[in-house]
């Protein structure tokens, strides 16, 4: 059964647990989603027990009308994608709000992944409310800076030293 839900915006004071398989179920149930915000301003010092990965983010972006996404993801590993998944592109998404999403060095891999699958992306703000105080915010600031640089010069050329 599918529904015509176009916008989901949930902001609560506690972390929300969600995994990639549940993202698949959401996309199947709500294929008309245009905007998906699930605690995009999360400011806790600990992530939920389970988070969608970059693969889950990509699956969410399959909704043909999706243009805004904000949620906490686990970006510590670049996922292995199926052939079909590796072809997914969403050109409508320009901003991706990642809250206090876990991420590790080298962040260039995350920036490459995001720009490969979201070629119109111009910004990836981390948690804007306490930038610098959250464990991952400074790494997301680097990803955001790399994406802005790539957009400005039309190139994905970075070295590990850029980090």
What label would you give each PLM region?
Residues 64, 116-123:
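Structural alpha-beta junctions
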Residues 124-130:
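A generic structural motif
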Residues 1-25, 37-112, 130-163:
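Leucine-rich repeat
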């Amino acid at each position: 059964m599918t529904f015509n839900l176009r916008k989901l915006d949930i902001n609560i004071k506690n972390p929300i647990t969600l995994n990639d398989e549940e993202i698949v179920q959401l996309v199947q149930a709500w294929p008309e989603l245009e905007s998906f915000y699930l605690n995009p301003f999360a400011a806790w010092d600990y992530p939920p027990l389970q988070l969608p990965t970059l693969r889950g983010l990509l699956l969410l972006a399959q909704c043909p009308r999706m243009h805004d996404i904000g949620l906490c993801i686990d970006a510590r590993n670049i996922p292995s994608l199926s052939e079909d998944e590796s072809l997914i592109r969403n050109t409508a998404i320009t901003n991706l709000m990642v809250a206090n999403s876990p991420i590790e060095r080298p962040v260039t891999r995350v920036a490459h992944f995001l720009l490969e699958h979201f070629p119109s992306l111009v910004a990836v703000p981390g948690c804007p409310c306490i930038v610098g105080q959250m464990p991952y915010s400074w790494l997301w600031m680097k990803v955001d800076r790399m994406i802005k640089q790539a957009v400005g010069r039309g190139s994905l050329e970075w070295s590990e030293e850029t980090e």
